[in-house]
Amino acid sequence: MLGICIMTGGCRRQHGANGLTPVTLQTDWYPQPEHGGFYDAQIRGYYKDEGLDVTIRPGGPYVNAEQQVSVGEAQFAMGSSDRVLQAVGNGEPIVAVAATMQRDPQALMLHQDSPVKSFQDLDGHAVAIKLGATWFSYLVQRYHLKNVREIPATYSVANFMQDPGYIQQIFVTSEPFFARQAGARVRTMLISETGYNPYRVIFTSRAFLQQHPEIVAKFVRASLRGWRDYLIHPDDINAAIGKLNPALSVAQMQFSYQGLRDQHFIAGDDPSGAELGQFTAARWTSMYQQLLDLKVIEKPFDPAIAYTLQFLPKGGS
């Protein structure tokens, strides 16, 4: 299914037996509504309308999507603008081509009665996160936290339910549902409200972009069409996602969808004109500067090599 063309210059992308061009999308987690637009484009035939046969490969906590794309195991992947910039700084030849979320749904979840009322209050507490998370370093620096501890995330609410002082990293569209279903009263604090707000993006390899810009354009166009459709007509797509990931209930998927829609994570609500799929050079530069300040990017480079505005709705800005 995957040709070696993506690793070398000057060769054509091969068509499958059905006459469609096969490509793979590596997601960042197991099938869920946060991927709804991609499944919409696949199920409703929008990829096929563009001549593409798209395989959606589920991710998980230990999948390195940047590496998958760099070595040609996938042509496209989901990620975030901060991770793309860090990967490019580390020599990974990847390029972001469109945004799938204008706002980042990462948050901290706390019990309703927690004494932690703001990010400044995290001092003296432990926080369960994916160890090494850059946003956590940003919080420590911005709020001058001296005594906050990282503990490994378990990707479950079990520890949260047992410990009234527990604080954990979450997607605000996911874990609060499970905690409330189990009887907890919870609060959340969005990381994006601190000023650290990466896009969620689609990225590809620099080689694939250079060799197959027409395929990239088709994939972006069909994916954004799927996202527009999913935000209006989610039910049958959620039913299909539920078959792929039976751990998700109808109620949980509805909770996730409503969060994505009502909090404008996908389409954005920026008065300056943020819209589905778009990103701006100014915001990429701002994120790059934050990473430089945190010293997670050690050797400066032009952040413009990490993204392209070529495929964005109305050209981006």
Language model segments and positions:
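Short, glycine-/small- and polar/acidic-enriched structural segments
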Residues: 16-170, 189-190
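Stable alpha-helical elements in mature extracytoplasmic
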Residues: 34, 43, 62-65, 80-83, ...
